[in-house]
């Protein structure tokens, strides 16, 4: 189960990176917030994966786009910093 989650997160992150790298330099610069948040979400989830229960992993894997869904939730927040993002990810995992 854990390997499936690792593979899925890696695939989503690589697809995101690939889509960004196809953009112009100016467009990449304009997406720096998205790049930062998506990278941090990916890192947080990869770090947490070892501690997740099977039920939590199944719930995450049931999402269509794990990283983009969490990014969308972050966009609704007023502020952004790493600890708050980590809390957001943890809270979403708890309510799955």
Where do the PLM segments sit?
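Acidic interaction surfaces
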Residues: 1-96
């Amino acid at each position: 189960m854990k390997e499936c989650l690792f593979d899925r997160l890696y695939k989503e992150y690589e697809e995101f990176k690939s889509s960004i790298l196809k953009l112009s330099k100016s467009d990449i610069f304009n997406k720096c917030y998205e790049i930062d948040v998506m990278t941090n979400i990916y890192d947080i989830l990869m770090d947490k994966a070892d501690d997740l229960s099977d039920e939590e992993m199944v719930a995450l894997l049931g999402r269509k786009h794990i990283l983009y869904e969490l990014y969308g939730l972050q966009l609704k927040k007023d502020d952004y910093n790493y600890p708050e993002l980590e809390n957001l990810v943890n809270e979403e995992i708890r309510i799955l």
